[in-house]
């Protein structure tokens, strides 16, 4: 004999076989194992102690085809009578049409040497949590049949604002402002430490606790004491204008003295007095820098020469 079939509580597949992760494949595999357990139980009741794997697979395929044919025929009889779900009468008619004696079923079910097959364990599928849940689902009103689809989730048609109300608590606002200020200071300190010169508290590790290097600052009030470029330019312009006026007055005095050389003695004495006055005035003008504080210049009158 080759491979032996499993007992009533076992299966006909090898223990080291790979199992599929697809739910449909798992369902077909579980159904196939259940049929193999049924075939093994029937063989044990018939007195067989072992069986080849090929024979067990053949009997399993025959049992599966027989059950599938009963279900297909029962459904066709059900739809023929304008119904959606088959009943016991449909199954009885199917068995009669297939040549099975229905009267022997009660005696076969009550046999003494029959073996009880435990139901396979049912694993519940993991429930996927819904992303949005708001409120409770509405049940169907009495006038809507139960086979109709359920109402959609309430979050699909209920207004659910997503914005948050502004916080008005004074303590929370102060804490938030303080934390923002602290974060800004830390970010600015790190930026200055990365871009500029730094000093470290530890000689071995320079990158630990970097400090911004201290730089000597100039005297803050020194710029207010020093004259600006505009003031220096104005001072130079006033000095040049004063020098030009002084040269003009000297030239006029010399010209007047040469013209009046042939005048009379009285006129010469008057001219000397006027020249001395003009010299004193020029000395005063050279001393006074402000043009608004200088004395007013009177026009000089020239006397005509008398015919002798």
From Swiss-Prot:
Phenotype seen when the gene is deleted: Death during early embryonic development. The inner cell mass cells of mutant embryos died of apoptosis.
Tissue: Low level of expression throughout the brain with slightly higher expression in the hippocampus.
Listed SUPFAM superfamilies: Histone-fold
Residue positions, PTM Phosphothreonine: 128
Chain span(s) of sequence motif Nuclear localization signal: 292-305
Biased composition (Basic residues): 295-308
Keywords: Acetylation, Cytoplasm, Developmental protein, Differentiation, Nucleus, Phosphoprotein, Transcription, Transcription regulation
Alphabetized InterPro entries for the sequence: BTP, Histone-fold, TAF8, TFIID_su8_C
Biased composition (Low complexity): 268-281
Entry's localization field: Nucleus; Cytoplasm
Residues modified to Phosphoserine: 269
Region Disordered, annotated ranges: 1-29, 235-308
Record's compositionally biased regions (Acidic residues): 235-248
In-chain residues carrying the UniProt-annotated modification N-acetylalanine: 2
Superkingdom, natural source: Eukaryota
CDD domains: HFD_TAF8, TAF8
Bias (Polar residues): 14-24
Record GO terms (molecular function): protein heterodimerization activity
Additional information: 'Taube nuss' means 'empty nut' in German.
Known partners and oligomeric status: Component of the TFIID basal transcription factor complex, composed of TATA-box-binding protein TBP, and a number of TBP-associated factors (TAFs), including TAF1, TAF2, TAF3, TAF4, TAF5, TAF6, TAF7, TAF8, TAF9, TAF10, TAF11, TAF12 and TAF13. Interacts with TBP, TAF1, TAF6, TAF10, TAF11 and TAF13. Component also of a small TAF complex (SMAT) containing TAF8, TAF10 and SUPT7L. Forms a heterodimer with TAF10. Interaction with TAF10 is mediated mainly via its histone fold domain while interaction with SUPT7L is via its C-terminal region.
Reported function: The TFIID basal transcription factor complex plays a major role in the initiation of RNA polymerase II (Pol II)-dependent transcription. TFIID recognizes and binds promoters with or without a TATA box via its subunit TBP, a TATA-box-binding protein, and promotes assembly of the pre-initiation complex (PIC). The TFIID complex consists of TBP and TBP-associated factors (TAFs), including TAF1, TAF2, TAF3, TAF4, TAF5, TAF6, TAF7, TAF8, TAF9, TAF10, TAF11, TAF12 and TAF13. The TFIID complex structure can be divided into 3 modules TFIID-A, TFIID-B, and TFIID-C.
Protein family (similarity comment): Belongs to the TAF8 family.
Protein name: Transcription initiation factor TFIID subunit 8
Organism: Mus musculus (Mouse)
Phylogenetic classification of the source organism: Eukaryota, Metazoa, Chordata, Craniata, Vertebrata
